[in-house]
Design a protein with these regions (language model features):
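Short acidic/polar alpha-helix capping motifs at helix-coil junctions
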Residues: 2, 36-38, 71-74
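N-terminal beta1-alpha1 ligand-phosphate binding loop
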Residues: 1-23
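A short beta-strand-loop structural module common to alpha/beta enzyme folds
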Residues: 26-39
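FMN-binding flavodoxin-like domain, especially the glycine-rich phosphate-binding loop
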Residues: 12-15, 23, 27, 44-173
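Short, flexible active-site loop motifs that bind/organize anionic cofactors or intermediates
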Residues: 3, 32, 148
Length: 173
């Protein structure tokens, strides 16, 4: 079983989570992480897909400005060895071009700390931005999306990423 979790301020991350679910209907319906009473439910999944916006641009920590920020430490203490985890992030590549989707990296690092097998990396070459903490090598540590300046690209990026995830998370296939 694969769960889709998100946190949102304006509703955009929830909307994108729902749109992603249309491409991977074998996953559970998206769930707001603030509605999760016991994070240990994540330990019972084969795969986890997380959606996170970046609101606190330039911050060293708590970059999302959402419910994710208050549970990062708890995520790091979970036992997620062997679990596949993918992250999508929302940001604004033109207004906040020096902090594009920075919150993805923070969530990524805590899931890694919990022993998760991180998947869903996306090559940075098809994106226009100046800097992002979410770059590892030549790739983003997840799928960056820009609903402010590049919303016309979101559905095709989601569809491509969903296909990629079906190859990386066996229980989605």
């Amino acid at each position: 079983t694969v769960g889709i979790y998100y946190a949102t301020t304006t509703g955009k991350t929830e909307d994108v989570a729902d749109r992603l679910h249309n491409f991977i209907s074998s996953a559970e319906s998206p769930k707001d992480v603030s509605d999760v009473d016991d994070l240990s439910e994540l330990e019972g999944l084969d795969g986890i897909i997380c959606g996170i916006p970046t609101w606190n641009t330039g911050a060293d920590e708590e970059r999302s400005g959402t419910a994710w920020d208050s549970i990062l430490e708890d995520i790091g203490e979970l036992s997620l060895s062997g679990k596949k985890v993918a992250i999508f992030g929302l940001g604004d590549s033109s207004t906040y071009t020096e902090n594009y989707c920075d919150a993805m990296e923070e969530l990524h690092s805590y899931f890694q700390k919990a022993g998760a097998d991180m998947v869903g990396y996306v090559d940075k070459s098809s994106y226009t931005f100046e800097e992002s903490k979410s770059i590892i090598g030549e790739s983003f540590c997840g799928l960056p999306l820009d609903e402010d300046s590049e919303s016309d690209l979101t559905d095709s990026r989601l569809e491509t990423w969903a296909s990629q995830l079906k190859g990386e998370i066996p229980s989605l296939g």
